From Swiss-Prot:
GO terms for biological process: cell population proliferation; cell surface receptor signaling pathway via STAT; megakaryocyte development; megakaryocyte differentiation; positive regulation of cell population proliferation; positive regulation of ERK1 and ERK2 cascade; positive regulation of hematopoietic stem cell proliferation; positive regulation of MAPK cascade. This is Thrombopoietin. It comes from Homo sapiens (Human). Its main location: secreted. Changing R119C: In CAMT2; likely pathogenic; severely decreased function in thrombopoietin-mediated signaling pathway; results in reduced protein secretion; does not affect protein degradation.
């Protein structure tokens, strides 16, 4: 949704800029005239690279581009405009007439490019001076192709340039469209209705509230987006805070404190496996010998305790009786479950023998 809102705001800004701006005619920009003059020089220089340039079979009529500056200043603006429009129109007709006399040659290609530049100049002047029918001016006949390119250059440097430098500012202000004032409060819905029908439905659905200006709407959107950033950061921090809890659970499961394992195995403590039925206590390691009391503070070498051991209590020393007692000896009285079990087992063996 944020991307859609951003695109709509950009569209509104572009629409407002196109509506409020008053584009001046191309002729009011002197860079256009400078570019046309540079391009005409480039075309004229390429003419010398053509292999064969012959005079035209039939002379063409070209406008008279020479003028007197003093006489030019005394003329009215309308007379100057009609004179320039007539000269450019005659030049375009002369270029097309000269090209029609040639076949597909290098000169014909250059004349085609020159006609495009003349059309561009004529369109720019008509947007500034109007499209009234210009009167016929003075003309001269020429057969030399170089005269066509030179006429265009002299026209740009002379009459057109002086027209724009002297009275161009007045003409540009007169021909510029009036600017429309922007109301202090503009509804976004009303502005969006002026857009094409494809986007009007989407814009009316997404935006039902009005804003004062398009700039304030963009500012509110940025503030709303910034307000969402702390919430995203809080969610991330909460997720990070849950990680230690999962680690503690895993640690407890591995240590066997959840009831999954009764305790550390003999392999964990380093004790070897003892097969069932083996009663040789001499082969047992020291930590499994009867009467061995491990130190809670100093475990044996190579062994580690996972949890602190409780305080050691005095362990009674248990003496094992032989499996086959002497029948003449008095029967001992068992004092513990372990002695009782060994005594019963010895009696069973003696009866079987």
């Amino acid at each position: 949704m944020e991307l859609t809102e951003l695109l709509l705001v950009v569209m509104l800004l572009l629409t407002a800029r196109l509506t409020l701006s008053s584009p001046a005619p191309p002729a009011c920009d002197l860079r256009v005239l400078s570019k046309l003059l540079r391009d005409s020089h480039v075309l004229h220089s390429r003419l010398s690279q053509c292999p064969e340039v012959h005079p035209l079979p039939t002379p063409v009529l070209l406008p008279a581009v020479d003028f007197s500056l003093g006489e030019w200043k005394t003329q009215m603006e309308e007379t100057k405009a009609q004179d320039i429009l007539g000269a450019v129109t005659l030049l375009l007709e002369g270029v097309m007439a000269a090209r029609g006399q040639l076949g597909p040659t290098c000169l014909s290609s250059l004349l085609g490019q020159l006609s495009g530049q003349v059309r561009l100049l004529l369109g720019a002047l008509q947007s500034l001076l109007g499209t009234q029918l210009p009167p016929q001016g003075r003309t001269t006949a020429h057969k030399d192709p170089n005269a066509i390119f030179l006429s265009f250059q002299h026209l740009l440097r002379g009459k057109v340039r002086f027209l724009m430098l002297v009275g161009g500012s007045t003409l540009c202000v007169r021909r510029a469209p009036p600017t429309t004032a922007v109301p202090s409060r503009t509804s976004l819905v009303l502005t969006l209705n002026e857009l094409p029908n494809r986007t009007s439905g989407l814009l009316e659905t997404n935006f039902t509230a009005s804003a004062r200006t398009t700039g304030s709407g963009l500012l509110k959107w940025q503030q709303g987006f910034r307000a969402k950033i702390p919430g995203l950061l809080n969610q991330t921090s909460r997720s990070l805070d849950q990680i230690p809890g999962y680690l503690n659970r895993i640690h407890e499961l591995l240590n066997g404190t959840r009831g999954l394992f009764p305790g550390p195995s003999r392999r964990t403590l380093g004790a070897p496996d003892i097969s069932s039925g083996t009663s040789d206590t001499g082969s047992l390691p020291p930590n499994l010998q009867p009467g061995y009391s491990p130190s809670p503070t100093h475990p044996p070498t190579g062994q580690y305790t996972l949890f602190p051991l409780p305080p050691t209590l005095p362990t009674p020393v248990v003496q094992l009786h032989p499996l086959l007692p002497d029948p003449s000896a008095p029967t001992p009285t068992p004092t513990s479950p372990l002695l009782n079990t060994s005594y019963t087992h010895s009696q069973n063996l003696s009866q079987e023998g």
